Regions:
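Catalytic micro-motifs at enzyme active sites that drive phosphoryl/nucleotidyl and oxygen chemistry
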Residues: 30-32, 156
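Glycine-rich loop at the start of a catalytic domain that most often binds anionic cofactors/ligands
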Residues: 57-61
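Structured, hydrophobic secondary-structure cores that serve as assembly/anchoring elements
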Residues: 13, 43, 49, 62-64, ...
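Sequence/fold signature of self-assembling virion shell proteins
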Residues: 2-28, 35-51, 71-76, 82, ...
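Phosphate-binding glycine-rich loops and adjacent basic patches that engage nucleotide phosphates
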Residues: 3-8, 63-73, 104-117
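Alpha-helical scaffold segments that mediate packing/assembly in large oligomeric complexes
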Residues: 90-159, 172, 291-296
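Internal, well-folded beta-alpha domain core
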Residues: 122-139, 150, 154-155, 159-182, ...
Length: 296
């Protein structure tokens, strides 16, 4: 009878898988200096300083003012699941591989898509609450897509959002518009096998990441897995700099209880998985995120 802690054994595998398959992975690593205040709360520093004053060339300097406080954010997305596995369905001599297969399928079909759905919808919630830039009136076409993009880029430039590191998340439909956009210049490459690559990987040094449209809704129902809410709107693109976001995985737990470990396992295996995380848009950096949304 044993309990295997697979979260430790599969740490590298999961990290590589998430980096490859989680579209919003870059947002999960932003602002590493922000720490947890307690088990459920992270604290966002808010530092305000006064500006220069005229120097009088007499002894002493002008006194400035400094204000330092914290904006607490409580993590709320705490998810878990368990599966009972009959011993006839698992080869005990290859236990790790069997659990890895369960984990791989669950992460691919459930956990990773849900994390993207939650993260992108949470960005929309933050933009709505902080009155950020959400365009829900312009109909995107190949003729105006670059103009809409340039307008959002200009707003960020004017607000002092860093140029380096901006990411443009787009649905396949918007990605298709970018390929056909009026005024866009591309270098078309032909490799040794005569395959033609027409992909647009960046725009004005902004990295483009294509995301399934099902993962870019404004609202989801998380009662049983993750499904788009009936009144959800479609997010078409998100232009964001990761510095305006704080996202944290607080707790990850993956265990397998062997037969007879406790009364629930009986003669079978019990697989448990828990993930506790959240994402927050920083109010003072709301200019670092913009969206285009189509109403349902």
């Amino acid at each position: 009878m044993a309990v295997y802690q697979y979260a430790e054994q599969f740490t590298q595998f999961l990290a590589q898988k998430y980096e490859k398959e989680l579209c919003s992975d870059a947002l999960m690593h932003s602002n590493p200096q922000i720490t947890f205040l307690n088990a459920q709360t992270i604290k966002l520093p808010r530092l305000t300083l006064s500006g220069y004053k005229d120097h009088t060339r007499t002894a002493g300097f002008n006194a400035g003012t400094i204000s330092n406080d914290w904006e607490p954010k409580k993590l709320a997305h705490d998810r878990d699941i368990e599966f009972f596995v009959d011993p006839m369905d698992i080869d005990e001599t290859n236990l790790a591989l069997s659990v890895a297969n369960i984990q791989n399928v669950f992460e691919t079909e459930q956990a990773i898509p849900e994390k993207d759905c939650y993260n992108f919808s949470k960005l929309h919630t933050g933009l709505t609450n902080f009155h950020g830039s959400i365009d829900s009136t312009t109909v995107l076409t190949a003729q105006n897509i670059l103009t809409v993009f340039d307008e959002e880029m200009s707003k960020m430039d004017d607000a002092g959002v860093p140029v380096d590191g901006r990411i443009l998340y787009v649905t396949p439909t918007v990605n298709k518009l970018l390929k056909a956009a009026d005024g866009i210049q591309r270098m078309i490459t032909v490799n040794s096998s005569n395959a033609v690559n027409r992909n647009v990987h960046s725009l004005d040094d902004v990295t483009i990441k294509m995301v399934q449209s099902g993962r870019m809704k404004t609202k989801y129902n998380f009662t049983d897995g993750c499904v788009a809410a009936a009144d959800a709107d479609q997010i078409n693109f998100i232009l964001v700099h990761p510095s305006c976001v704080v996202a944290r995985d607080k707790y990850a737990y993956i265990s397998l209880f062997t037969p007879g470990t406790d009364s629930r396992t009986a003669d079978g295996y019990l697989y448990q998985n828990r993930n506790y995380w959240d994402l927050f848009l920083i109010e003072r950096k709301v200019a670092g995120c913009a969206m285009h949304v189509t109403k349902h």
